[in-house]
Amino acid sequence: MCVRVLTSDVSSTESANMRIQTFKRVSLKALLMMPFLAFNLGQASDTNFAPKAQLVIDKVYAIVGPLGQRSVANAGLNANYGFVITENGVILIDSGASAHSAAMLEKAVAEVTKQPVRWVLNTGSQDHRWLGNDYFARKGAQVHALAATVQTQKASAEQQVSGMARFVGDQMKGTSPRQADVVHPGAEVTLQLGGIQFQWIDTSAHYPGDTMIHLPQKSVTFTGDLVYVDRLLGVLPQSNVRKANQAFERLRALSPALVVPGHGQVTNLAKAQKETGDYYQFLIANIGVAARNLDSMSETLDKFASPLQFKHLQNFEELHRGNMNRVFVDFEANP
């Protein structure tokens, strides 16, 4: 199925309405497949990726994936993961893109502790966040997710498995999409696992049901795909920059000392603000406002094509114009 990105000018209310209707006719299946169709972000840094745990703070670790596209070389682990070591076992944050890549994450954990993975928490519903669930569940781990996350996982499972197979091929063998054993209702949950407290907060930023996980005792937040650093974030058709901006304000209120972003190196809140929070605000204040004013789409995209504060980010040239396009169409349809 071909998904067309709209670029025509807005010269009248009639043409604006036609574009809105075209946008609304894009099927759910096409939207769920959009990450595979839209972006080609391969890079040399993917080559021979082996997950390695890096200490964030006492007993809390991050596994930082490469910034490029899913590939055989990175086993679909082009995202960030994390884990917390407790006396009762390991709490893993996100399970990987397949049974194969889940085993790679398990190996990275085993390099720093003999404790088994007892719990898995899914921060989101993109393939590399949860398609390793079954691997860990079959080994006795208890998988947790918020209800909204599970809903999106169920809707996208079939398309994500076939889509990931196009990138990693035979590495998908033995992978079964499996949702959480423990599903938590509501937009915010407080959990106590292995003596560690977790504040689990819905963001619905990059994907519906995306979340962030805050560890108040450690002053660390695993943001999921709310925050990107070192590379430009991607706005998908199902992304919601207004919710993302609100969720980022909640992150600011949590005021973590350390941030483990969805993509990019472990960082602090100031850098997360500069490379993600400011970009959400840029899109809303400039592209969103122009759409509400029924300004010309093409003129708006040209006007804001080269914001200096974001041009240094990897993937800027590939993603920025498409991001603006989707935000314009969204605000035009939902002013």
Where are these regions (language model features)?
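Bacterial N-terminal signal peptides that target proteins for export
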Residues: 19-31
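Bacterial N-terminal signal peptides
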Residues: 29-40
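Conserved beta-strand hairpin/beta-sheet module of binuclear metal-dependent hydrolase folds
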Residues: 58-108, 213-215, 219-224
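Active-site neighborhood of phospho(di)ester-bond hydrolases with catalytic His/Asp-centered motifs
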Residues: 93-95, 118-126, 144-147, 222-224, ...
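Active-site HxH/HxHxD metal-binding segment of metal-dependent hydrolases
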Residues: 107-186
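Accessory terminal helices/loops
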Residues: 253-258, 266-335
